[in-house]
């Protein structure tokens, strides 16, 4: 029920029952790989030595590794590509405008760099005259550091995307703005759009943002059609894993990975192609890119973050994390129901670009259309909307046609906001 503050005990019971079933089912899955074709194969190009070294320098681009400390102590890794391969000056002959590119859920900045150089968004924008920055949110492989906590401690994972809104994005924006002295173009994909919408709605970063491009925009998830995600959300799987003491949600190893396999078996889903199962039928991926993606992703997040996303699916609203009871919510928020994020409060003069796909199982067309309706009072000359009929969720980050279909339009949009 929308606005509910209680986690029904019957639902927790269902989740625990599901987990018990999963545990009993694991022996039947031992011979199958969680992530399809990579099972048993050696990894290809990985970012073990850092994203710059593994995936930017090899293409002939300059790249800098930066560390940023959030107000709550997390040390986030960022990459900066300060210029294009040819070292050309900015398009207007002046200073290069900074662009922050923010990845989605269960991946990191490497997800933007899986194709040949001329198909990778960060490198395309650098060649177009922008100062490109890539963020890596807390919990991903190069942002698993903290001033006094470590990933083996439960407290390290005590966060949701609320903290990405309150701490991670502001730290990245402040760092970029402090070094460049310029307003920042923001580009998000999937969860990267959600935390952008939430942050801009609370007006925290609007003085530093020049424009925003949202690919596969996610805010409302009630029509999500990815079967594996829907099952996980509606059976309270994340809540149950939290109860059983697994604060880190790591799809690639341990029990979480086993549970994903068990969901596939129970629901009759062919998870050999897990990318399509989760994201929709992508039109424009090639096999080598998918293999490289699966060699590097998915990345960890917190189980609490997955609970928050599951709440968004079930409650059909965009609210802060629900602590499960009126008393606990009052303790955290001063009210029984978690505060809502009011997307319509995003400043109407902020230039926005949306691109969404007709086959996306996560950013479903109905949910995106409902999201766009929240901008009905936005300045009409500041709204730019692109619908790509045959695109699904992953096409926007590694589709072989994305440069011509989406990225060139993004670059043109950013240049118009100079």
Swiss-Prot record:
Glycans are attached at residues 158, 286, 342. It catalyses: a triacylglycerol + H2O = a diacylglycerol + a fatty acid + H(+). GO terms for molecular function: lipase activity; triacylglycerol lipase activity. InterPro entries: AB_hydrolase_fold, AB_hydrolase_lipase, Lipase_euk. Residues 1-31 form the signal peptide. The active site is at 190 (nucleophile), 360 (charge relay system), 393 (charge relay system). It is an enzyme of class 3 (hydrolase). Its EC number is 3.1.1.3. It is found in: Secreted. Coiled coil: none annotated. One of its GO terms (biological process) is lipid catabolic process. Its main location: secreted. One of its GO terms (cellular component) is extracellular region. Belongs to the AB hydrolase superfamily. Lipase family. Triacylglycerol (TAG) lipase. May be involved for TAG storage breakdown during seed germination. PANTHER family: LYSOSOMAL ACID LIPASE-RELATED (PTHR11005). This is Triacylglycerol lipase 2. It comes from Arabidopsis thaliana (Mouse-ear cress).
């Amino acid at each position: 029920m929308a606005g509910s503050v209680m986690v029904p005990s019957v639902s927790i019971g269902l989740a625990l029952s599901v987990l018990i079933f999963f545990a009993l089912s694991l022996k039947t899955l031992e011979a199958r790989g969680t992530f399809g074709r990579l099972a048993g194969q050696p990894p290809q190009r990985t970012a073990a030595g850092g994203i710059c070294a593994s995936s930017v320098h090899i293409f002939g681009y300059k790249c800098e590794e930066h560390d940023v400390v959030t107000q709550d102590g997390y040390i986030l890794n960022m990459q900066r590509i300060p210029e294009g391969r040819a070292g050309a000056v900015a398009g207007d002959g002046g200073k290069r405008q900074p662009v922050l590119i923010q990845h989605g859920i269960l991946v990191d900045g490497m997800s933007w760099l899986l194709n040949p150089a001329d198909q990778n968004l960060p490198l395309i924008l650098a060649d177009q005259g922008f100062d490109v920055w890539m963020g890596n949110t807390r919990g991903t492989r190069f942002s698993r550091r903290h001033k006094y906590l470590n990933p083996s401690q439960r407290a390290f994972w005590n966060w949701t995307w609320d903290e990405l809104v309150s701490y991670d994005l502001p730290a990245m924006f402040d760092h970029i703005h402090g070094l460049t002295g310029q307003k920042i173009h923001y580009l998000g994909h999937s969860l990267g759009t959600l935390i952008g919408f939430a942050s801009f709605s609370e007006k925290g970063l609007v003085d530093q943002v020049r424009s925003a491009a949202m690919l596969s925009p996610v805010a409302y998830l009630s029509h999500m059609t990815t079967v594996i995600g829907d099952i996980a959300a509606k059976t309270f799987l994340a809540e149950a894993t939290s109860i059983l003491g697994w604060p880190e949600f790591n799809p690639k190893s341990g029990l979480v990975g086993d549970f994903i396999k068990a969901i596939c078996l129970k629901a009759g889903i062919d998870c050999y192609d897990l990318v399509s199962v989760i994201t929709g039928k992508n039109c424009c991926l090639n096999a080598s890119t998918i293999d490289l993606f699966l060699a590097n992703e998915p990345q960890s997040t917190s189980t609490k973050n997955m609970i928050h996303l599951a709440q968004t699916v079930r409650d059909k609203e965009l609210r802060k994390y629900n602590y499960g009871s009126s008393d606990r919510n009052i303790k955290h928020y001063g009210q029984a129901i978690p505060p809502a994020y009011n997307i319509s409060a995003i400043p109407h003069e902020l230039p926005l670009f949306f691109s969404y796909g007709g086959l996306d199982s996560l950013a479903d067309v109905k949910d995106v259309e409902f999201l766009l309706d929240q901008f009905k009072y936005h300045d009409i000359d500041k709204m730019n909307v692109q619908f790509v009929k045959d695109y699904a969720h992953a096409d926007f980050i590694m589709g072989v046609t994305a440069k011509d279909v989406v990225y060139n339009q993004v670059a043109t949009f950013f240049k118009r906001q100079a």
